[in-house]
Amino acid sequence: MSVETSTDAAGAGETRPLVAVLGGGRFGQALVRAAARTGEVVLWSRREQSDLPEGVRVTAELEEAAAAELILFAVPSRYAESVLSEVGAHLDGRHLLVHVSRGLIDDELQTMSHVLRRVTPCRRVGVLAGPISVDVLTNASPGAGVVGSEFPEVVDAVRGAIGGPTLRIYGNEDLRGVELAAALTGLLLLSMGFAQRVGFGPATIGAVGTRGVAEARRIGRALGAKPATFAGLACFGDLLAAASGSDRPEIELGRALAEGMTPKAAMLKAGGNIEGVEVARRVSEFGDRRGIRTPLADVIAEMVKGELTAADGVRKLMARDVGRE
């Protein structure tokens, strides 16, 4: 039974509170555009911004962003703690803090919500995940996403900020499960990308995808996540959307590796830092320590280190002993 729930967004005539977005990258800008359709937005960014919708105020001062109750955190994981330490001085228990990270913080697979609660006084936190692309947010294309949070008011706030007739926002109380599902989907997309470019057919790609979800579920179960979460939007839904045709950087990285590029060149072609690469290494090592089978993560980690070609990687996966599904 699905654990994801949805209700209608706020009525068109209602005025919602100010929303803040931290981070002016592509996804942060897309969040700004989506939120600007429903009310006022303040964007904190260290880079200059242009061509933003009316009702958007850009600031370089985190204190100004803290005027909003709902804060959408779209800062890359490697900069997250320093930004959170600074903004945390201006936050308190009334704030709702929701991140969009697809990364894992350390070798014990801690998620971003752990950092949010450790570095700031916020306790009502959440994650926005699922097949929500820049296109869906920017152009109001039909789509759906999920907010993982133990607090219904967090889900309601995000739904009121970016939800609407074309974007359904579901809720899932399994916060850590949604975070893990989002992070692990990144490494599944890497594997699907190189399988596509090597020339394997739909059957192989389907096998890689479905067994990848099973691998993600094993990791999640070991960390207390609900198995059903991995069948929802944050994992299977995101994977299906990307496999149906996507410009996701993880897919592009997998394709570039399959073309014989060095890991460094492949990363540059795909758009620089991709969190799925570090996720693969951490998951592979975590599996070794815990005795959990992680064949996809193992292969991807070897490929990124240049120890395995894409074709040999897929063959290695397909040559594994089979058992019950």
Enumerate the predicted regions with their spans.
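Rossmann-like NAD(P)(H) cofactor-binding subdomain of soluble oxidoreductases
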Residues: 28-32, 62-142, 158-160
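NAD(P)+-binding Rossmann beta1-loop-alpha1 motif at the extreme N-terminus of oxidoreductases
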Residues: 2-60, 66
